[in-house]
Amino acid sequence: PMKEVSIRGQGSLAYPGLRTQGNLETLNGPNDATRGLTSLADTFEHVIEELLDEQQVIQPSKENKDADLYSSRVMLSSQVPLEPPLLFLLEEYKNYLDAANMSMRVRRHSDPARRGELSVCDSTSEWVTAAEKKTAVDMSGATVTVLEKVPVPKGQLKQYFYETKCSSKGYAKEGCRGIDKRYWNSQCRTTQSYVRALTMDNKKRVGWRFIRIDTS
């Protein structure tokens, strides 16, 4: 089980590195430089797609209408992680590219930061410990206790969950952006996904189960 969880967690996959030959000064003019940067961008996108395809292979295939089945938001660590999960960031980038459905050049110009786009709902994300969660709902609908620490050969590691929730401001006052408030009422609601965690059921049985956490 530990091996399986490490595959699903942060920093366990072997991410290929990107190496380029030469630099911009050795290229023959701006056209070659542009082609070099475009090629590097295409290579980077290809690597991301391979990583996400590999992640999908190890995900369960059964769907659930109440929540996404799998999300890479769990990390085993001795201290609070300083950054969001890498696969979470890659998924966000991949979703953006899929939505754009255009060439790399047009995608770069359609960066939301350049167009001043805003999310439909405001949200906040943070790492949460099992001590803060305490309990969760598993795939069978039962409430289980989330264990704070996971035993490893050289000691124990804490379970951390990267949760995303709607901000109280967007939920309570403003509703969803892009909705005509003259005709429609809207509300930002936090949705959940399943992640694998070490838990204990009401019969004191400890095991790895899929539990729900807030993800958007």
From Swiss-Prot:
Disulfide bonds join 121-188. GO terms for cellular component: axon; dendrite; extracellular space; synaptic vesicle. InterPro entries: Brain-der_neurotrophic_factor, Cystine-knot_cytokine, Nerve_growth_factor-like, Nerve_growth_factor-rel, Nerve_growth_factor_CS. GO terms for biological process: cell surface receptor protein tyrosine kinase signaling pathway; modulation of chemical synaptic transmission; negative regulation of neuron apoptotic process; nerve development; nerve growth factor signaling pathway; neuron projection morphogenesis. It is found in: Secreted. It holds the Pfam family NGF. Keywords: Cleavage on pair of basic residues, Disulfide bond, Glycoprotein, Growth factor, Secreted. Its main location: secreted. Promotes the survival of neuronal populations that are all located either in the central nervous system or directly connected to it. This is Neurotrophic factor BDNF precursor form. The gene is BDNF.
